[in-house]
Regions:
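Short S/T/G/P-rich N-terminal loop/turn motif that feeds into the first structured element of a domain
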Residues: 1-55, 63-71, 89-105
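Conserved short beta-strand edge segments in small beta-sheet-based binding/regulatory domains
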Residues: 78-90
């Protein structure tokens, strides 16, 4: 199954540590996210906070990019976070693709 890397971030004033409304919403995510990921057939491999910033790194296994996008929207996380979204490949795969391409210099 394809892997996707997502980096989410928010400004300090949108941090659940500082904002009472977002703290309540953030606490709900502990119970809301697992069924939402299951609904979209997403398996989280890594979800870590990048200290001391306001960023989270996600490595997800998902059937397609749309499943990840839809999960983000349905969770409500996009209302207070920005997201960078990447397809992920193994180094073996990318090295094979590199060998298939002619050099340009």
């Amino acid at each position: 199954m394809p892997k996707y890397v997502v980096i989410s971030n928010h400004p300090p004033n949108s941090c659940p540590s500082a904002n009472a409304v977002l703290r309540k919403r953030g606490e709900k995510l502990d119970t809301d996210m697992p069924p939402l990921m299951q609904k979209h057939s997403i398996k989280p491999e890594v979800m870590v906070h990048l200290d001391p910033g306001h960023k989270v790194l996600w490595v997800l296994e998902a059937p397609n990019a749309e499943a990840v996008r839809d999960m983000i929207y349905e969770s409500g996380l996009s209302q207070w976070n920005d997201f960078e979204f990447y397809m992920a490949s193994t180094l073996d795969w990318i090295n094979e693709k590199i060998r298939e391409q002619p050099t340009i210099w």
